[in-house]
Amino acid sequence: MKDYKNELKVKVDLGENLRGSIPGLIKKVMYKTQYLEIQVEKKNLLPVLRFLKESSKYQCTMLLDIVCIDCLNIEEIKIGRFKIIYVLNSIYNNTRVHISTYVENNGIIETTSGLFESSVWLEREIWDMFGIYFEKHPDLRRILTDYGFVGYPLKKDFPITGYLEVYYDVADKKIIYKPIELMQEYRNYNFGAVWGDYERKVYLENIIK
C-alpha cells in the first residue's frame, strides 16, 4: 500500500527547499497528490527550469510533456489566457514537478529547446493548436495540420466547422481551399433537456401516445 503521507511530505520538503534556493523566482507552490506544481512568471521560466535540471538536489532531467490549457471565460484567471505546464520528472527524487506559467492570447514565450530536446516537437504542437509563438525555436512549423490551415483548432473560440473547406479537385488534379459555405445557420440544440427524471418521463409518455 502506498504511503501517501510520506509522498506528500517529500513534495512539501522539495517545494519549501526550492522556494528558499531561488528566492524571488517562484510565485506560488501547490502540493498535489501525484505531483508538485510550481507557478512562475513567464520571464522566470527558463531560470527555474535550468535550476531544476542542473541542481544535484532536484535532478529534474526529463521533460515528459508540455501542456497548454485555454482558460477563456474563466474569471478567476486574469494573468493570461493560456496556462502552459511543463511536466518534469526526477528519477532521483521519484517525483514529478509541474512548472506552470501564463501567456496572453497570441502571446510569445521563449523556447525551452536549449534545455530539453524533447520540447522541440511539443512546442510545435502548441504553436499549431493554440497559436503561441515560441521565440528562438529552431524549427517552428505546423506539425498536425496542413500548411494552408487557417486558425488554431484547440482555442475555445475556434469554430467547429473551421474557416476553410479542403477537397481534392479531380478535374484540376489539385487540392482546393475555399471558405466554408453552410447550407443553414448555426443552431444551438438543448440535448440535455430530455434526460432529467421529470422531463424524460414526459418525453417518453409523449412518444407512447
UniProtKB/Swiss-Prot annotation:
Enzyme's top EC category: translocase
Listed GO MF terms: NADH dehydrogenase (ubiquinone) activity
Cellular component aspect of the GO annotation: mitochondrial inner membrane
Keyword Translocase in record: yes
EC number: 7.1.1.2
Coiled coil: none
PROSITE patterns for the chain: COMPLEX1_30K
Protein origin, superkingdom: Eukaryota
Entry keyword set: Electron transport, Membrane, Mitochondrion, Mitochondrion inner membrane, NAD, Oxidoreductase, Respiratory chain, Translocase, Transport, Ubiquinone
Keyword Transferase: no
Annotated transmembrane regions: none
Cellular compartments annotated: Mitochondrion inner membrane
Reaction(s) catalysed by this chain's protein: a ubiquinone + NADH + 5 H(+)(in) = a ubiquinol + NAD(+) + 4 H(+)(out)
UniProt similarity note: Belongs to the complex I 30 kDa subunit family.
Function: Core subunit of the mitochondrial membrane respiratory chain NADH dehydrogenase (Complex I) that is believed to belong to the minimal assembly required for catalysis. Complex I functions in the transfer of electrons from NADH to the respiratory chain. The immediate electron acceptor for the enzyme is believed to be ubiquinone.
HAMAP family: NDH1_NuoC
Subunit and interaction comment: Complex I is composed of about 30 different subunits.
Protein's UniProt name: NADH-ubiquinone oxidoreductase subunit 9
